[in-house]
């Protein structure tokens, strides 16, 4: 078994962002000996968007020898490929060059204030303190950024920068190239229908059950981790209504096949 530190893997900003919630998939109970596994990996990543691809690369760099990404669509990108691409981060060299007063601490304070103080201070500070590191991580993995910062639409402060290229697609293009270089396969048209663990809602996660195009079913075992990076639920009327019933009447800019709706 590959020795992969959970702290090292999940401690990186890109990988931590990958620990998103997954909807439309349920847990099942299965004794490991009772399942005939079709393939075994060290790390299985669900979702080939920005978070999932970052998690896969991070896992490989943290020591996982065999990593796979599962994507239910026929192409990678998720919501990231539809995003404008702007990245807010208080990077000292950038704001000093622009003559702006900024810092990760100020970024956190302004973010909390913009959310009427409802955000979790610990998580917000983690976000703003790790943002410069995440930008550097992306640069180290092939993403090139424009040489200026600006106030992104919907934002209140000047601290965003855009990648050079097709907006959010620039991130995906670079990460796909790294996955190819690192021999990280992406299984397209592969939908996760069950996360298999020792007990219904407890115990170690053993792997996943997937359905591929044409109805083929596979059981994939994970010796170290299953990372759920399958997006949110902005296109799911039932779940968004929990926060605000009016949201069910709105359209969405989310990916055409988010996890909560298919």
Regions found by a protein language model. Give the residues of each.
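A short, basic/flexible loop-to-alpha-helix module at the beginning of a structural domain
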Residues: 27-39
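Aromatic pocket-lining residues of Rossmann-like dinucleotide-binding sites
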Residues: 59
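Glycine-rich, N-terminal phosphate-binding loop of Rossmann-like dinucleotide-binding domains
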Residues: 13, 48, 230-231
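N-terminal secretory signal peptides and thylakoid transit peptides that target proteins
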Residues: 1-17
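Beta1/beta-strand and adjacent pyrophosphate-binding region of the FAD-binding site
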Residues: 37-51
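Conserved beta-strand-loop-beta-strand element in the redox core of flavoprotein oxidoreductases
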Residues: 196-219
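Glycine-rich loop(s) and the adjacent beta-strand/alpha-helix scaffold that form part
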Residues: 215, 221-262
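Conserved N-terminal/central alpha/beta ligand/cofactor-binding core
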Residues: 66, 72-185, 189-194, 203, ...
